[in-house]
From Swiss-Prot:
Compositional bias of kind Basic residues: 87-115
Gene: HRCT1
Topology versus the membrane: Single-pass membrane protein
Region (Disordered): 86-115
A single Gene Ontology CC term: membrane
Transmembrane regions listed in the UniProt entry: 9-29
UniProt keyword annotations, A-Z: Membrane, Transmembrane, Transmembrane helix
Name by which UniProt lists this protein: Histidine-rich carboxyl terminus protein 1
Chief location of this protein within or outside the cell: membrane
Species this protein is from: Homo sapiens
Subcellular localization(s) per the UniProt record: Membrane
Taxonomic lineage from the root: Eukaryota, Metazoa, Chordata, Craniata, Vertebrata
Amino acid sequence: MLGLLGSTALVGWITGAAVAVLLLLLLLATCLFHGRQDCDVERNRTAAGGNRVRRAQPWPFRRRGHLGIFHHHRHPGHVSHVPNVGLHHHHHPRHTPHHLHHHHHPHRHHPRHAR
């Protein structure tokens, strides 16, 4: 009886160690893959006023922020039932300082507006 109990405990230790190593490798792979800063340059001059740079993210992390933090944007006229949880803030392209500065008056140095 003690031989069977000893072999069962040994199998349990080996299984537990294997699971722990696999979880550690998964965590390491997730951190390395998520921490990698591959930048995709998206050229959209009319909407963004220049080149926008966004980070490439793997599919499990898209639209969720960092591992389960809710990422909720408030839009005008939209009544939200979910409170704004997390530390994210959404910026519209028209709210950038460059666009605020040039929003209400023409570009004097631009050839179209020169008289």
